[in-house]
Amino acid sequence: MSKRFEEYARGARAIIVASERLFGQYGLDGISLRQIVVAAGQVNPSAVQHHFGSKRGLIQAVYEMRTPLVEAARQAKLDSMNKRETIEELLAAHLEPIIEVLPKAKRLLYARFMMRLLPLSDAEHPHFSCLDMCAPSVEIMSRMLAHFPKLAPDIVTTRVRMAVCVFLQGICDERRVRRLVSHAYRTEDIYWDEIFQIALSVFSNPYPPPRRFGARASEPRRNGKRPLKRNRRSGARA
């Protein structure tokens, strides 16, 4: 059963906050529990085991810290939709709340931590251990799957993960990109419109995709070597 952040003792909350920052910065395996406890200002070296049972329990608590706020915003977007929503509207309902309800500093911490979770399997990912908190996300995913009845569910979920990855990376890169000397993204709105459209574009790819990597393997060989390609414009070897 999931547990809200405010239900933890004060010391446990300090550990959760420190863990989000340190896991995001160093990775789930790049920082020791002892270092986290020290960073949280706690003196008991067994504090993680005391409050969370294990490292996995701590990761779960970090994930659940911001989940209720983000999920409530997702539910509000779902409530405002009609029954004929587009994939763009569904993706927006899933991603936009992150930048709408979390201040810049907190959403950067959130994004860095969430990026560390992306490689985890379903059995390891904390999302699947707190589905009672994540009903809006589950509903959004269900509707996304319904939009692509001819695609296998694993293909759709892979594309969703790629879209989420793009958006989270956009949060991580915002400060750097907005400071580029070209000033290509003069306003925050322009930047986020761009990031969102990049994320959305993964759903427009055909399946099966056009062959590229497999096509190279099947090219005819001359004397045991593949023929060199020439640049059409200059004739130079590529």
What is each of the regions a protein language model found here?
Residues 12-17, 52-75:
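An amphipathic alpha-helix adjacent to DNA-recognition modules
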